C-alpha cells in the first residue's frame, strides 16, 4: 500500500483528517495511481486550494498479484473483505490521525477496483459512507455468473450474493450512503452495468450522481473522474 499525507499533517500531526481508500484495476498496482493517475499532483493541487488540508489517501492492493482477482471477497482465494474492512482501517487508526466519523471515510476505485468500492460500501455502510465507482462492473465476475460462482466463490451462490452489490442494494436500505458513478463516454462494455447500479442504488436510498468523461476504459477518464470527485468528497467530509 501507499499512503499520501497532506501538507497540513506535517504542520499539525495530531489534527484528525478524512480518509480515502483507493484501489486500482486488474492488472494494476497501487503505483499506477501515482504515475498514470497523477495522484500526488492532484492531491497537492487540491491541498493548495484548501489551506494545506486534504484527505489522507491509502492506495491499497486488493489483488495480491498481477493476474489474480479474488473479487474483493473473503473466499478460499483470499480474505480481501477482511483486509479492506478491518485490516486497513485498523492500521490507519493505529498509525495516523484519521477521523473516527464514518462520514469522513470514503472508498474509491477504477474498473474492478470500482466494483470493490461498491462491494465494500454495501457490505460495510457503517464504515465507509462515500464512494467513487469509476468504470466498475455491476457484479463481481470472472466471466459469466456460473463460472464466477464456481471459480470465485467456492461454488456457493449464497457467498456470491453476500458480495454482490446489486443483490445487497436490492435487499437493504442505504440512506446514509452516497457516491459518484462515472465512466468514459465510449466505454460501452461497462456503461450498461453502471446504469444498472445507478437504478438499483437509488431505489435502496443511496444518493447517487452519474458523470461521464471523454474517452474509454482508460486512465484519461479515471484521473479526471477522481480529480472531479474530490470537491464532492470534500463537501461530504466537511472540509
Predicted features along the sequence, with ranges:
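Non-catalytic cap/lid and distal C-terminal segments of serine-dependent acyl enzymes
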Residues: 1-239
